[in-house]
């Protein structure tokens, strides 16, 4: 079984969010199952220089983008025994930032076409091309409408994974012809048309052989108008070819016993060292140094989706409780300002860090007692999985992957790995936080839920097996 992942980012080469983590870890677990897996990515300016230096040039060619022919360089790097191919074009990818450019539609039209064009030149005919999010969704459209009648491409199948339905890649109608040389017969409900525009993600949904998303609950939710972002009709029609597969994390990377960024390593059998991580974090962030104060961590984008409205609404009430709050992330100005002002008002109890720092993120996962994710919606979520691994008890709203991975702790049965609330409601969130911190002073009870969290399987092993079964079903 030969599978090629086509994506817009993957750690350690490029990462803006959870997609990069997934593409940087899942292929290695598939390889352990015997899959011949490779990955193809854009060669961004921001790829670390030491990795660029290890890339080997294969060849250069031209790729049609509508009526134009654009330069395409092909490079390869073998990383942990997996071939990573890179599509090089200085005009499209030698700039700051992976996304957010006015010509993103053209940039990823070029990348999608390049993926298909270069396959015969790299001696790689995959059984399946696994595409991810809107940036590579149109590979499925191109394959089905323009390539599949050619012998080389005849039996290639595509799987398309939705990581976040909110971001769809919607561009003017003209791009179908101008960038893809596509036929107007595909500009309809069963094709790529979306309110008079071209929707790349819709192309992925309608032309892929199978669709997955990143948790079973999210797969159900997106068939409903509230979560469907205007594509619920397509997803409902395709529900027999739609499956939710819960994301995992690379538990060899996220490992509190070996993580070099922690103040002190620890395990579920040695929780005393976890306290030292909290004390070290308090010192680093100039918070009151006190092991007895419950600390709540948030590593998040500061946007509405992540439930920041609920937190902002309850900040003053939360400060009436004996807690500390540590926030790391960037996002909308209004939320940044709310947390900036809160940290000024409560300097020993709130730490606001409006940037991203991988070391500090790991120290928050390792040092906090609780990890708050009150999301409005959450396709899967990786933060709660990392928190579980580090024994930082999640407090989450029951949506998407949060509902699938976090079970409310029952003091009687002693089962459960976190605390949850159902409704998107600030008071429900506050009451759940109060219930969680009520348990904190009783170390025997609290350490039980911590150990439950740390013993939760959060790696890729089971999900990789599910993907392999899915690939095989496509023949």
UniProtKB/Swiss-Prot annotation:
SUPFAM superfamilies: UDP-Glycosyltransferase/glycogen phosphorylase. It catalyses: [(1->4)-alpha-D-glucosyl](n) + ADP-alpha-D-glucose = [(1->4)-alpha-D-glucosyl](n+1) + ADP + H(+). Pfam families: Glyco_transf_5, Glycos_transf_1. InterPro entries: Glyco_trans_1 (IPR001296), GS/SS (IPR011835), Starch_synth_cat_dom (IPR013534). One of its GO terms (molecular function) is alpha-1,4-glucan glucosyltransferase (UDP-glucose donor) activity. ADP-alpha-D-glucose binds at residue 15. GO terms for biological process: glycogen biosynthetic process. Pathway: Glycan biosynthesis; glycogen biosynthesis. Keywords: Glycogen biosynthesis, Glycosyltransferase, Transferase. Its EC number is 2.4.1.21. HAMAP family: Glycogen_synth. Belongs to the glycosyltransferase 1 family. Bacterial/plant glycogen synthase subfamily. This is Glycogen synthase. It comes from Alkaliphilus metalliredigens (strain QYMF). The lineage of its organism: Bacteria, Bacillati, Bacillota, Clostridia, Peptostreptococcales. The gene is glgA.
């Amino acid at each position: 079984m030969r599978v090629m992942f086509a994506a817009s980012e993957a750690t350690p080469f490029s990462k803006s969010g959870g997609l990069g983590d997934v593409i940087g870890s899942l292929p290695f677990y598939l390889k352990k199952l015997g899959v011949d897996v490779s990955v193809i990515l854009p060669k961004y300016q921001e790829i670390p220089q030491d990795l660029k230096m290890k890339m080997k040039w294969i060849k250069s060619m031209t790729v049609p983008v509508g009526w134009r022919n654009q330069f395409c360089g092909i490079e390869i790097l073998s990383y942990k025994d997996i071939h990573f191919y890179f599509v090089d074009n200085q005009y499209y990818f030698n700039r700051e930032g992976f996304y957010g450019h006015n010509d993103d539609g053209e940039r990823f039209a070029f990348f999608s076409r390049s993926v298909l064009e270069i396959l015969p030149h790299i001696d790689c005919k995959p059984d399946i091309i696994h595409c991810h999010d809107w940036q590579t969704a149109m590979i499925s459209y191109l394959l089905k409408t323009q390539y599949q009648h050619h012998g080389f491409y005849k039996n290639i199948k595509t799987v398309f994974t939705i990581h976040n339905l909110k971001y769809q890649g919607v561009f003017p109608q003209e791009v179908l012809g101008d960038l893809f040389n596509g036929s107007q017969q595909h500009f309809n409900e069963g094709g790529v048309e979306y309110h008079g525009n071209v929707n790349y993600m819709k192309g992925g949904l309608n032309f892929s052989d199978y669709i997955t998303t990143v948790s079973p609950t999210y797969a159900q939710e997106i068939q409903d108008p509230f979560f469907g972002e205007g594509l619920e009709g397509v997803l409902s029609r395709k529900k027999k070819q739609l499956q939710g597969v819960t994301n995992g994390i690379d538990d060899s990377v996220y490992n509190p016993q070996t993580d070099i960024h922690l103040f002190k390593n620890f395990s579920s059998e040695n929780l005393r060292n976890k306290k030292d991580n909290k004390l070290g974090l308090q010192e680093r962030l100039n918070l009151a140094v006190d092991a007895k104060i419950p600390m709540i961590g948030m590593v998040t984008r500061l946007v509405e989706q992540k439930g920041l409205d609920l937190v902002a609404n309850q900040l003053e009430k939360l400060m009436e409780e004996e807690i500390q709050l540590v926030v790391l992330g960037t996002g909308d100005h209004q939320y940044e300002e709310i947390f900036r002002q809160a940290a000024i008002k409560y300097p020993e109890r709130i730490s606001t860090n409006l940037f991203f720092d991988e070391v500090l993120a790991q120290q928050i996962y390792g040092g906090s007692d609780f990890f708050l994710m009150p999301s409005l919606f959450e396709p899967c979520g990786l933060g709660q999985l990392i928190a579980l691994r580090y024994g930082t008890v999640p407090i989450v709203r029951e949506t998407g992957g949060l509902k699938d991975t976090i079970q409310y702790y029952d003091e009687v049965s002693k089962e459960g790995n976190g605390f949850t609330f159902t409704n998107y409601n600030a008071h429900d969130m506050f009451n759940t936080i109060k219930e969680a911190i009520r348990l904190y002073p009783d170390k025997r009870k609290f350490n039980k839920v911590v150990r439950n969290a740390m013993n939760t399987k959060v790696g890729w092993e089971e999900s990789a097996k599910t993907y392999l079964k899915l690939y095989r079903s496509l023949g």
